[in-house]
UniProtKB/Swiss-Prot annotation:
Heme b binds at H260. One of its GO terms (cellular component) is cytosol. Keywords: Heme, Hydrogen peroxide, Iron, Metal-binding, Oxidoreductase, Peroxidase. It comes from Mesorhizobium japonicum (strain LMG 29417 / CECT 9101 / MAFF 303099) (Mesorhizobium loti (strain MAFF 303099)). The active site is at H97. PROSITE patterns: PEROXIDASE_1, PEROXIDASE_2, PEROXIDASE_4. Belongs to the peroxidase family. Peroxidase/catalase subfamily. This is Catalase-peroxidase. Disulfide bonds: none annotated. NCBIfam families: cat_per_HPI, PRK15061.1. It is an enzyme of class 1 (oxidoreductase). There is a cross-link at W96-Y219 (Tryptophyl-tyrosyl-methioninium (Trp-Tyr) (with M-245)). Formation of the three residue Trp-Tyr-Met cross-link is important for the catalase, but not the peroxidase activity of the enzyme. Binds 1 heme b (iron(II)-protoporphyrin IX) group per dimer.
Length: 732
């Protein structure tokens, strides 16, 4: 008998829209997602391995691009007419929203990869009609091609927009290389609906690492919290969300007032007449969304946020008029034509002072958002706003600096900045590291220093732990942290609990003494920095541990790191880099949003590691004794400080049965199946390599009888990658 076939239940093409079979994540939604370690690979990159964006950008005629952008600002297109005959305000919003997703907690978001082109950002409610802004830019991107990335072009266009309306910007740096697929590692919130706010608990406590109040918003709801038009409540939301982007009160006021000096919001009619976002639109829309059936759907009939606000009398010219109007009128609550809460001057004041965006015969009164009034009624914001109102030069300088910080915050050290418009001034938020000012040590010096380090009495565990603690702060998201700068000896890092401050101080004292003696013995300008010596010490420890396991390895080393000063280290800015959970070191502190194993993969992604690299590093760090507090969890070996594959061999031993020691299931005992004797203890960060099928497959590679040499070799490669993660001055 022939089997029945059912087109509705049979296997489907895995790329079919809406008809693919259930994925593993559908069946097991709590399954650990290691796929975030394999995104942005060469398989999705059309540019090829030889493509070097930095070199392409250096050959770009930047002046020509800027000239073309200036021309575009007033070249209004019939298919999407420019408000007030000038696209500048639209492009400022585009650039702001490209950069404004950045959050300091994990360094994710921001403008650095051009993610506004992809879902979900291209379809967020707060990014309504920015699809048109990017389409307006396409002829310029098409003209200059690979020499300027979308990521750089979005920000440069925002700068040119400001300049074209009479504002002097602080500077611009290129160097943001595009990616070619949506980022899968960014947690945007738990909600399943746009504008929902399940991210709050308690007394409006916003979940970390989030930086926006509702799903699909960049920062705050302009109508006030959940649409409640309360300026003081809005101020609380503003302060929280902007702080999560590393902005203080002065920078916050400058950004809001500066941005709202220009342009308008769009709420000409019933928002229900607006169609779906780009990702949900029909194929013939060609990636555009929010098609509106209200009037012409564009120009004077455009609907975006639903608010219909024009702040100033000169919306395409830099001025202090935002503050003139903010303080010059008493405001009363009203509603836009789309029904959104906004504010207008009482008693009809200000009527006729503001131009219409598309009809020169019309005039209006100015209007404000609830979040604008927060700058007047919140005491701290009001003090700053009044000062800016009375001192326009201070306002302009503050906005220029805050805009530069907003648009460059996720680029990492200045060494990555490209182009002739990079300012010379060093800024505290740039994590400044001194330029190399001495002759670097050579290979012979490095060998001598390693021998001296090993003779100092420092153990393999101490050396490896210190080097790892120094380097593993790196975040590939915003290119912060890492071993360069030796900030592990400075506040706040030297006092982080995960770094075992007392033990760390002993190691650093010995390494500093070795560096001091070496430098004093030189007759020329040759020196070794502590930053280099910390990494070199870790390498020495690994080579010693490998030798103990019967392997001869040379851990690669490139000198050239420098030591930053405490004055070059913003304690408040560095605080979010402190790990509260670190599976690489089997460390957990307090309640976490993520499980230990999720946090381990998240940390690996920030370190730009692959799943094999994550696996081999955890196995190696355990046997080398790198656990915080010298915990024995996961140290599955009888030969500690030996670079063996024992972690994997013993984890996968079927003679061991694992059981949780408490209902929390965070610590486990591995008992001999026959005798019941406790052989090992481990955490979720250990047992996940035997539990998760993909990680177990990798663990099996390193547990085989012929894998000892491969394990040592692969560990060294992965270790070196982490040690050099922040070395933007060297190739590879």
């Amino acid at each position: 008998m022939d089997a029945k076939t059912d087109d509705n239940s049979a296997g489907k093409c895995p790329v079919a829209h809406g008809s693919a079979g259930r994925t593993n994540r559908d069946w097991w939604p709590n399954q650990l997602n290691v796929q975030i370690l394999h995104q942005q690979s060469s398989l999705s990159d059309p540019m090829g391995e030889a493509f070097d964006y930095a070199e392409e950008f250096k050959s770009l005629d930047l002046d020509a691009v800027i000239k073309d952008l200036h021309a575009l600002m007033t070249d209004s297109q019939e298919w999407w007419p420019a408000d007030f005959g000038h696209y500048g305000p639209l492009f400022i919003r585009m650039a702001w929203h490209s950069a404004g997703t950045y959050r300091i907690a994990d360094g994710r978001g921001g403008a650095g990869a051009g993610q506004q082109r992809f879902a979900p950002l291209n379809s967020w409610p707060d990014n309504v009609n920015l699809d048109k802004a990017r389409r307006l830019l396409w002829p310029i991107k098409q003209k200059y091609g690979r020499k300027i990335s979308w990521a750089d072009l979005l920000i440069l266009t925002g700068n040119v927009a400001l300049e074209s309306m009479g504002f002097k910007t602080f500077g611009f740096a290129g160097g943001r290389a595009d990616v070619w697929e949506p980022e899968q590692d960014v947690y945007w919130g738990p909600e399943g609906k746009w504008l929902a706010d399940e991210r709050y608990s308690g007394d409006r406590d916003l979940q970390n690492p989030l930086g926006a109040v509702q799903m699909g918003l960049i920062y705050v709801n302009p109508e006030g919290p959940n649409g409640n038009p309360d300026p003081l409540a809005a101020a609380r939301d503003i302060r929280d969300t902007f702080a999560r982007m590393a902005m203080n009160d002065e920078e916050t006021v400058a950004l809001i007032a500066g941005g709202h000096t220009f342009g308008k919001t769009h709420g000409a009619g019933d928002a229900s007449l607006v169609g779906v976002e780009p990702e949900g639109a029909d194929i013939e829309q060609q990636g555009l969304g929010w098609a509106s059936k209200f009037g012409t759907g564009k120009g004077g009939d455009a609907i975006g946020s639903g608010l219909e606000v024009i702040w100033t009398t000169t919306p395409t010219k830099w001025s202090n008029n935002f503050f003139d109007n903010l303080f010059g009128f008493d405001w009363e609550l009203t509603k836009s034509p789309a029904g959104a809460h906004q504010w207008t001057p009482k008693g009809g004041a200000g009527a006729g002072t503001v131009p219409d965006a598309h009809n020169s015969a019309k005039r209006h009164a100015p209007s404000m958002l609830t979040t604008d009034l927060a700058l007047r009624f919140d005491p701290s914001y009001a003090t700053i706003s009044k000062r800016f109102h009375e001192n326009p030069d201070q306002f302009a300088d503050a906005f220029a600096r805050a805009w530069y910080k907003l648009t460059h915050r996720d680029m990492g050290p200045v060494a990555r900045y490209l182009g002739p418009l990079v300012p010379k001034e060093e800024l505290p938020w740039q994590d400044v590291i001194p330029v190399v000012d001495h002759v670097l040590i050579d290979e012979q010096d490095a060998e001598a220093l390693k021998a001296e380090i090993l003779a100092s009495g420092l153990s393999v565990s101490q050396l490896v732990s210190t080097a790892w603690a120094s380097a593993s702060t790196f975040r590939g998201s915003d290119k912060r942290g890492g071993a360069n700068g030796a900030r592990i000896r400075l506040s706040p890092q030297k006092d982080w609990a995960v770094n075992q401050p007392a033990e760390l101080a002993k190691v650093l004292d010995k390494l500093q003494a070795i560096a001091k003696d070496f430098n004093a013995a030189q007759t020329g300008s040759k020196k070794v920095s502590l930053a280099d010596l910390i990494v070199l010490g870790g390498n020495a420890g690994i080579e010693k541990a490998a030798k103990a396991a019967g392997h001869s390895v040379d851990v690669p080393f490139w000198p050239g790191r420098m030591d930053a000063s405490q004055e070059q280290t913003d304690i408040h800015s560095f605080a979010p880099l402190e790990p509260t959970v670190d599976g690489f070191r089997n460390y957990v502190s307090g309640k976490q949003r993520l499980t230990v194993e999720e946090a381990l993969v998240d940390r690996a992604q920030l370190l730009t590691l692959t799943a094999p690299e994550l696996t081999v590093l955890v196995g190696g760090l355990r046997v080398l004794g790198a656990n915080a507090g010298q915990s024995k969890h996961g140290v599955f070996t009888k030969q500690p400080e030996t670079l063996s594959n024992d972690f994997f061999v013993n984890l996968l031993d079927m003679g061991t049965e694992w059981k949780a020691t408490s209902d929390a299931k965070d610590v486990f005992e591995g008992r001999d199946r026959k005798t019941g004797e406790v052989k090992w203890t481990g955490t979720r960060a250990d047992l996940i390599f035997g539990s998760h099928s993909q990680l177990r497959a990798l663990a099996e590679v390193y547990a085989t009888a012929d894998a000892k040499a491969k394990f040592a070799k692969d560990f060294v490669v992965a270790w070196t990658k982490v040690m050099n993660a922040d070395r933007f001055d060297i190739a590879g």
